Amino acid sequence: MYTVDIDTGGTMTDALVSDGEQRHAIKVDTTPHDYTVSFNGCLSEAAKRLGYPSTEAFLAKVGMIRWSSTITTNVLGERRGSKVGLLVTEGNEENLYGTVQSPVVGELVDERNIIGLPSNPTAVDILSGVKQLLEGGVRRICVCLANAFPDNGAEREIKAVIEDQYPDHIIGAVPVLLGSEMAPLRHDQTRVHYSLMNAYTHTQLATSLFKAEDLLRDDHNWTGPLLIGNTNGGVARIGKTKSVDTIESGPVFGTFGGAYMARLYGLKDVVCFDVGGTTTKASIIRDGQPMFQRGGELMEVPVQSSFAMLRSAVVGGGSIARVRDKSVTLGPESMGAAPGPACYGLGGNEATLTDALLALGYLDPNNFLGGRRQLKVDLARAAIERNVAKPLGVSLEVAALSIRDEAVAMMTELLQATLAEAKLTAQDAALFAFGGNGPMFAAFVAERLGVQAAYAFNLGPVFSAFGSAISDVVHVYERGVDLRWNATVKGQLLPTLDALQTQAERDLKGESFDPAKAAYVWELDFGTTEAEVSTVRAELAQSAASTVLDALTQAVTAAGVASLPLLGARLSSRFVVGAHGMKKRADRVPAEAPASREMRFNGASEAASPVYRWETMNVGDIAVGPAVVNGSTLTCPIPPRWQLRVDDYGNAELSRAQ
């Protein structure tokens, strides 16, 4: 049976189809007007690639589909979510329990749709506020009171009053969500922000997910599990997924794929960069695991919770190059997949980063996306000449180099800042490059950054889909507490641990998974503030709460944190499903002499340089720059003084030439 892993990005939608022995990488254009079109396009292309007469015939051999995306990320970034109303404690309408005005006010929620309620609101207070919100056209109402966790009785009472007046079956009723249930944490502002982001993005994500589920069932007669990628690096069924938990799930899976490869290679610290059509993402792997942060900004929204550290720069293959103040700039505007770069020949007339790479000779115009799209060099050159070279007063070739160098500078700056935030230096880390355009910049960025080795992957263009392919079903449950680790803590903490375990087991059973076969990771957060936290953990099989507490007690003692306040408890349940990891490459293919093509790597004139075909290179083969490796899944320029070696897993290792 096959597994299918699909990753919907802003420009391209990627898929990885695997039976555990062979893998097939697929890319189609993302369709932002309806994400299920590109979702279905991946399945149709897979059926065609594998020789099945129809998508339905192919899906009959598929045991599982996992889908990660940037759908919620795009909804937040483009500010096109649902109209949401907030009921908060009076006096916090602007700051939402922070010290200054919350950045979501006026962005994710109109200030007129934030209603302050008195400490003990009457039914008249509540319904008057709701009437004002409904007249403002809100589609969801979030109730987020101060100090509503762990005791959320006041929020529940408000919800009961609203639902009594506006029951589900009447016209005009809207969902009422409680911040204490959406984000059961002690930090008031975090509860508001999580609740708001979830309500804001829910409709757009749910529309795509349920439409995909209907398409699979009704059009293709497939009833297997459709699992949705979450930002914790796991997957879950649609009914167990909150919209806010899918933010950046696609890029996060790339980081988890990188962590898998770091452990495979025995690398301790790695900085990853994922270059797509619109953005570049940077992340860190520490000790073989993705680096998480406690507190910070999630999509520019401050929260005090744990999430994968991911940083972005608005530069990608579709980024538009312009001249401002006699210098080249890139982005933030992007041509996307349609009309795309000028070289696509689909009507785009702006010069983009992809056009520059083609003009410099790095791309094979006849083998783009595995030959499924022919690139037009003349259109790329004309766009660069018109939009960059003439305004700068330089040759077309110098203009193309300037575009490339600006991209390298932006990517390097992003990686330097990310390394500094992680308290690492470039000399401490290896560099992983993936995404559709990552390998294109691996050596250039490695040289400028100062790392000793860089890696580009055979599955690099679909690397987030690879991260999904090694993922398991994961659920994370969190409860904020305010306790001291003393003689009475056992009686106080046991009910919380028991409630978390019960919820995890119930959710696994609801997804037809056996809780006894799952792994459970328990964590306790200690600290004097929400921003300065020490975490202890214990990993167990399914156990009674008392056994869990005994294991955590040992961990607390070993960590020496018993004197600090206990701020929260967290449980991650993990159920292993059909994961397909990386295997050493065993096959050998007939050697092929490299071709040649005119390329430009620096200010010198163009010169004919070797072009190695990736599909004809074997383990141990070395290509020395200046050269380029072109293939259906990997294109990697090798500048002078650098070399590329095919490693044991069929990936590319870049290093300075001896």
From Swiss-Prot:
Q: What induces it?
A: By ethylbenzene, toluene and acetophenone.
Q: Which GO terms describe its molecular function?
A: 5-oxoprolinase (ATP-hydrolyzing) activity; ATP binding; ligase activity
**Which reaction(s) does its UniProt entry say it catalyses?**
acetophenone + hydrogencarbonate + 2 ATP + H2O = 3-oxo-3-phenylpropanoate + 2 ADP + 2 phosphate + 2 H(+)
Q: Which family does it belong to?
A: Belongs to the oxoprolinase family.
As recorded in UniProt, its EC number(s) are: 6.4.1.8
Task: Say which enzyme class the record assigns.
Answer: ligase
Q: Gene name on record?
A: apc1
Show the coiled coil region(s). Answer: none
Q: What is its main location?
A: cytoplasm
Q: Which cofactor does it need?
A: Mg(2+); Mn(2+)
Annotated protein name in UniProt:
Acetophenone carboxylase alpha subunit
Q: How is its activity regulated?
A: Inhibited by zinc ions, carbamoylphosphate and beta,gamma-imido-ATP.
Q: Which GO terms describe its cellular component?
A: cytosol
